[in-house]
Amino acid sequence: MSIKYLIVLGIRPDIINYHPLVKELKKRKCDFIIVHTGQHYSYFFDGLFFKQLDFPHPDYHLKVGSGTQAQQLGKLVQKFEIVLRKEKPDLVFSFSDANTSLSGIVASKMGIKVAHLEAGMRSFDWRMPEEKNRRLMDSISDYLFTPTLSTEQNLLNEGIPPHRIFRVGKLIYDVLDHFKKEIDQNKILEKLQIERKDYFLVTAHRPENVEVRTPLKNILETLGVLYKKYGKKVIFPIHPRTRKSIKKFRLKIPSGIITMNPIGFLEFSKLEKNAFCCVTDSGTVQEDSCIFKVPCVTMRISTERSETVEVGSNIVAGLNKNHILEAVDRMVNKKPNWKNPYGKPQSAKKTIKILESRSNEILSPKVWWNHPKIEKNLSISEYQKSWKNKLLPDKTFN
């Protein structure tokens, strides 16, 4: 009897990072289904990526959409439970830290095994919604697949049992390695009439950066200074949220900045790989630039990709204009000779191999127990003894 896997995704990075996992599952002829929560959905943010990555069309689309945290999570929990009861998977994959990842909580409560990919990442900034999601998912997952030694250590420090932790590297490294030829052959540089290492690549989309006037104004002004100081164009694919805020706050885009709508995975990866420097608030760009050996400056006050700072590929500069400019100057004047902290591009292969080796554990009958009936005049010690006798051993949590 083989394991039935369920992959749940909801945002663009999920589609990209799940690619090697789906490829490995197909190669092994495993049984799997794909559920798209619809946390984010548009042609540019999903459809184009499905096409470029040759990603299977989801079996279910929950159409959760945007809204408040409570609205989004409420719809996710209700709709995802229906799919789980119908499909009865043996294991659910949950990726990283978006709200979609919390679908794993529903699976766990139903007695279904959960594997958390990109586990152990920590910004240690409790103000970030993603930090809460990461910690919640790591605490309830049965199998935690970490990308680096430091993420593994984070879990051990939090008391996660070692037998649930597996260091396998980064899925994005698998993706970039697989599509290396397609990325190199992409013609986005010619289309934009720019040369290799003669432009900055910028992304800004986080709500705290673009939904408040002052930080967004600072970012735009900083980009204008970069163009004047270095004489290099600034390529800025604008997230819909950012474009909406620029219009709302009536901000001007400085000269030298080339703006565009969101672009495909291959186009963006080609721009990343050949940039003079990446200036971003994106977690994925921090990883990509580290792998591509392109200097990166992060416009945030914290990062869960601490390994990029440790190896020297990235500086977390905050949102102060002078601090960002100083960080850029430091990064572009150093040799990109840092070590890749992500091992080899074999993360998906290792992940599935580990899970398949534990098929007996994953496929074992689900154990349920009923709370002991409370009798009148039962002492606390007698009640505790009765409760303990009702528990059946579960080797997974020993």
What are these regions (language model features)?
Residues 1-232, 236-238, 242-398:
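Nucleotide-activated sugar donor-binding and catalytic core shared by glycosyltransferases
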